[in-house]
Every structure is written in C-alpha cells, then in structure tokens.
Amino acid sequence: MDPYPTWMQDVPEVDIPITGVEGRLIASPHGQVVFFRAIEEVEVPPHAHGGQWGIVVTGRLQLTVDGEATTYEPGETYEIPSGAEHSARLEAGTSLIDVFQDPDRYRPK
C-alpha cells in the first residue's frame, strides 16, 4: 500500500538504477526531495554523494554508514554526511522521504 496521497502520482517519477524501488522527485537548484517506496526487499550497494537526511515513513531501513549499521523504523530520522560511504537494506513495503544536498542527485524519468 502506498502511504503517500493520490495527488503524489502527479509528481515526476525518479529514474532509479535499482530494481524493486520507485520514487517521486521534487527538485530545486538547492537540493532534492525523493519519496521512495520499496516494492520488494532492496539492497542498495555502497556508494557516496553529498549530504542526505531522511525519515522512515513505513517499514524498516537498515543503513550502514562508514561501516556502522543502524536499523530505523517509522518516525525515525537519519543523516548521512557528505562523502560518507553508505549502503542500505529496505524491507518490502518500506517508504522513506529523503532530502539530498546535491541538486542533481537524481533525474526524473
């Protein structure tokens, strides 16, 4: 079930290079906000980029930042410092709202 309101379907889809996750993108010259939803269990491989802040809306997120793993549940927030290597595991049905420092982190489909 999608936790976001139906009007969010009008927000552009984000082009994500990972199978099993979809998202909606709101972008500005100063950063991006992406509303992610894991359709199935998803493993995000290690990577790095500009700063990121997020909140778990539904489900569970296991986030590993600089080798330290932490599990987040609905209502909990997380922050990834700029340049920090990180990876993630999202359970099926997990929804996140992520704010990215980089204004060009993702592109719309």
Question: Where does each model-flagged region fall?
Answer:
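A short, N-terminal "cap"/entry segment at the start of jelly-roll beta-barrel domains
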Residues: 1-30, 34-35, 109
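Conserved short histidine dyad/triad with adjacent acidic residue
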Residues: 29-48
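Short beta-strand His + acidic residue motifs that chelate non-heme Fe in jelly-roll/DSBH
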Residues: 44-46, 63-64, 80, 85-91
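Glycine- and acidic-residue-biased ligand/ion/polar-headgroup-sensing regions
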Residues: 49-62, 66
